[in-house]
Amino acid sequence: MKKLLIDDFEIEKNDWGYYFTANIDFMQQNSELLLNYDTEDEVSEVELKNILNKSLEKINNVLKKAEKNKPQLMKLLKEKNYINLATEWVKWEEGGIKVEEEENCYLIDDNKVYTPITEKDFEKSMNFGEIGTDIYSDGETEDISVYITFEPDYFAGHCIECYIDKNGNFSVNGLAG
């Protein structure tokens, strides 16, 4: 992942303050990074860029460490039974469509999915599409949230919400959506 710079971000105002967005390369995928800065005050562009700059030092460091921790994330997802849960969701009547001509085969969005889902197929299907955190005027940040979706969509429009701590370690919050 390349180091994120101030100029990589667009800054927009919303009802709760400001947010900064950038498209980044994370885990060798295109992801959207969203940073929220909650304030009721009017803040100049110079001040906003200063706040962003202070936060980016930590964010760059955390994301760099997290990219090296994909095996730790996969171990967590396996321990918390998400690969088996994906298989259950695919087989569920609201999940995939059973292909009658093939054993243990289901269609999801015109993709054939064979059950049980393997760890390799589960990992290949992961998308790190949305990443976000709150930032503060002193440069501090909250743990980073990562929303993992899947292609094919094993969890019928849901994602797995994870957090990345300051050391780049993952924790799993659960299904969201």
Regions found by a protein language model. Name each.
Residues M1-F20, K120-G177:
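Acidic, proline/glycine-rich low-complexity IDRs
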Residues M1-N104:
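N-terminal "domain-start" segment
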Residues K64-Y154:
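Amphipathic protein-protein interaction modules
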